[in-house]
Regions:
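Domain-scale signature associated with acetyltransferase and cell-envelope carbohydrate enzymes
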Residues: 2-153, 159, 169-182, 186-187, ...
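Cys/His-clustered metal-coordination modules, chiefly Zn-binding fingers
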Residues: 225
Length: 259
């Protein structure tokens, strides 16, 4: 099992630094696998966890495909040159469900916070220092690549409720409204939330550039590139395109991209 673990986690030439970090990752890797999976599955070590990943909340559940391989999911590894991976710390905070559809890599310094349903299909790769906050549902299709310093969040975290006031009287008077004017129109309106969580759906073979923000309600179709620094909060259609700008629009059509 030890040799399988070392070979699977590094298919390239291993430096002394890499080897040392892999050995240090064994305790957290064992803890993660034994917590989430049956013993037979856990002993295959399908998920490897860097010692620099803070396992803040090991609740909820983690789902794997039927065919399980050693180190098919890597959390907290990689080496993006403009970050210091020696001090780059990730966080795993899960009380919901995380589903891995195959091989996946969550790079060093990345934060995963899930109380809803997060689905990462085969070939998912998040390079470094990015954050996923899932309160409802976030889905990534096959072969998705996320660059560094990205935020994916399907919630506003804090609820906002409707508060009806007599705006007509306030505008006309030009004075500070009295408490009677500001009172809600009804208890039903007072309890109506106006910012519910909304799912984020990302298709197959999507590349999200660095410093992008994907907020609730985002839908990205297959074979799309999201340009660096773009903020998305709505649904797009079409394929083989580049989306970018603020507000975002389709910048180019009929493109394809490769890793």
């Amino acid at each position: 099992m030890r040799n399988d673990y070392l070979c699977a986690i590094n298919q390239t030439t291993m430096t002394a630094f890499d080897f040392f970090n892999i050995i240090r990752s064994i305790p957290k890797t064992l803890r993660f696998n034994l917590h989430y999976f049956p013993l037979k599955t856990a002993l295959k070590l399908p998920v490897v966890v860097s010692h620099r990943t803070y396992l803040r909340e090991l609740h909820g559940k983690v789902e794997l495909p039927e065919k399980v391989e050693t180190a098919m999911v890597k959390i907290g590894f990689g080496d993006v040159g403009h970050y210091d991976r020696k001090r780059s710390r990730g966080i795993w905070q899960v009380s919901g469900t995380v589903s891995f559809g195959g091989k996946a890599s969550i790079g060093h310094g990345s934060k995963i916070s899930v109380r809803g349903n997060l689905c990462l299909s085969d070939g998912f790769n998040m390079t470094a220092e990015s954050t996923i906050v899932c309160a409802k549902e976030i889905r990534f299709g096959r072969d998705c690549l996320l660059s560094w310093d990205i935020l994916v969040m399907d919630t506003d975290e804090h609820p906002i409720y409707r508060h009806e006031t007599n705006r007509h009287e306030t505008r006309d008077s030009g004075s500070v409204p009295s408490p009677e004017v500001l009172r809600p129109a009804s208890n039903d309106m007072e309890n109506e939330r106006i910012n519910p969580d909304k799912a984020i759906l990302v298709g197959d073979h999507v590349w999200v550039g660095c410093k992008c923000v994907l907020l609730k309600g985002t839908q990205v179709p297959n074979n799309t590139v999201v340009a660096a620094g773009t903020l998305l909060a709505s649904a797009f259609s079409g394929e083989h395109q580049v989306i970018g700008g603020n507000p975002p629009t389709v910048l180019k059509h009929d493109i394809r991209w490769e890793h």
